[in-house]
């Protein structure tokens, strides 16, 4: 690797790791076997009697073909890379060729990752992310705001747009409640496993005695879904209130009496929206979020039923605590599901959370494969 830059060497290591992660989730022989089975099913004329079934098989065939072709392409690029690296020691032109292969590999590996790991129905969608402080007053409310900022910074780093949908400030500091809409390709796919309880341990700036406090805040992520999702919302099930938008949302928050709060009486789900320019728009956005939440509830119910059949329902309170952020007596952010940890708390709080997100995507993909 004599003439290859340090930056390129680092990229090659990263790509090898990502490729290894992909191969831990998917088996090329199994993909090809599945591909043959689906092709065989589609040659049976009777399958076309059921249009819905036929469409499902056609979509599956397309996805499997893409994965199969991309696995071959990535494998062949890695083989080319190996040869080019060997020859690059003596040949400057070949070192340049290594750079070109690495660039091509980056795109190919990313495409493969998205096809295999981000393959959920709503993964490509925008995401609504809500943060709610746990018990503990100002300390928890401040922690909730720190988390909200972390996700907003992460979204900015990704080049995603962020809209504040709801922002209720705390009495002294922090937030009582906040919801943001993160707009970008695969926003929901990346963030879906961030739902859960996040725990903070630090010396509280709000405690005159400078004692160590443990605070909790819960994060909930749901996809922005299209209006064609079949969820019935009956007007008589809704309690709709208007209030004046308030908060430290700065330029994001509208100050007129146009904020809307909707309570879905059968489930007790409460949704607020205050950032749109009119009461009507706020109501439409709130209804859209409510629809997504009801859909999520329905999916969760089905998932629970399956889990109960499989007998693997865990203790929700502990099982839901997904990550700890320790500021004192040492610094450490640790994900309890994947085991990924870092001592660089400042970078994490500034939105550098891709290491956690990527690890959890692989972790859950392995579990479901």
UniProtKB/Swiss-Prot annotation:
The modification N5-methylglutamine is found at residue 251. Keywords: Cytoplasm, Methylation, Protein biosynthesis. It holds the Pfam family PCRF. One of its GO terms (cellular component) is cytoplasm. This is Peptide chain release factor 2. Its main location: cytoplasm. PANTHER family: CLASS I PEPTIDE CHAIN RELEASE FACTOR, PEPTIDE CHAIN RELEASE FACTOR 2. Coiled coil: none annotated. Peptide chain release factor 2 directs the termination of translation in response to the peptide chain termination codons UGA and UAA. Belongs to the prokaryotic/mitochondrial release factor family. It is found in: Cytoplasm. It comes from Thermotoga maritima (strain ATCC 43589 / DSM 3109 / JCM 10099 / NBRC 100826 / MSB8). One of its GO terms (molecular function) is translation release factor activity, codon specific. Methylated by PrmC. Methylation increases the termination efficiency of RF2.
């Amino acid at each position: 690797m004599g003439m290859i830059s340090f930056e390129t060497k680092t990229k090659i290591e990263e790509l090898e790791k990502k490729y290894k992660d992909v191969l831990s989730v998917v088996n090329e022989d199994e993909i090809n076997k599945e591909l043959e089975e689906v092709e065989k099913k589609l040659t049976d004329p009777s399958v076309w009697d059921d249009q819905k079934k036929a469409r499902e098989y056609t979509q599956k065939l397309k996805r499997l073909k893409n994965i199969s072709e991309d696995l071959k392409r990535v494998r062949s690029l890695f083989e080319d890379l190996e040869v080019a690296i060997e020859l690059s020691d003596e040949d400057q032109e070949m070192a340049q060729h290594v750079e070109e292969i690495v660039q091509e590999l980056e795109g190919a590996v990313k495409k493969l990752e998205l096809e295999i790991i981000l393959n959920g129905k709503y993964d490509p969608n925008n995401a609504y992310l809500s943060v709610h402080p746990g018990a503990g007053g100002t300390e928890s409310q401040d922690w909730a705001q720190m988390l909200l900022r972390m996700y907003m910074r992460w979204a900015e780093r990704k080049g995603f747009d962020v809209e504040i949908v709801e922002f209720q400030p705390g009495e002294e500091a922090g937030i009582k409640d906040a919801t943001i809409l993160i707009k970008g390709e695969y926003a929901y796919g990346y963030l879906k496993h961030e739902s859960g309880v996040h725990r903070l341990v630090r010396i509280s700036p709000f405690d005159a005695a400078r004692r160590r406090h443990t605070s909790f805040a819960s994060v909930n992520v749901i996809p922005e879904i299209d209006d064609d999702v079949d969820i019935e919302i009956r007007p008589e099930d809704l309690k709709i209130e208007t209030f004046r938008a308030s908060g430290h949302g700065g330029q994001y928050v509208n100050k007129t009496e146009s904020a809307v709060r909707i309570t879905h009486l059968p489930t007790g789900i409460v949704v607020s929206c205050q950032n749109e320019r009119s009461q009507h728009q706020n109501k439409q956005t709130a209804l859209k979020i409510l629809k997504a939440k009801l859909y999520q509830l329905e999916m969760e119910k089905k998932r629970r039923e399956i889990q109960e059949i499989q007998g693997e329902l865990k203790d929700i309170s502990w099982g839901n605590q997904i990550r700890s952020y320790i500021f004192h007596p040492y610094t450490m952010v640790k994900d309890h599901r994947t085991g990924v940890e870092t001592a660089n708390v400042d970078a994490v709080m500034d939105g550098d959370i891709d290491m956690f997100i990527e690890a959890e995507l692989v972790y859950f993909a392995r579990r479901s494969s």
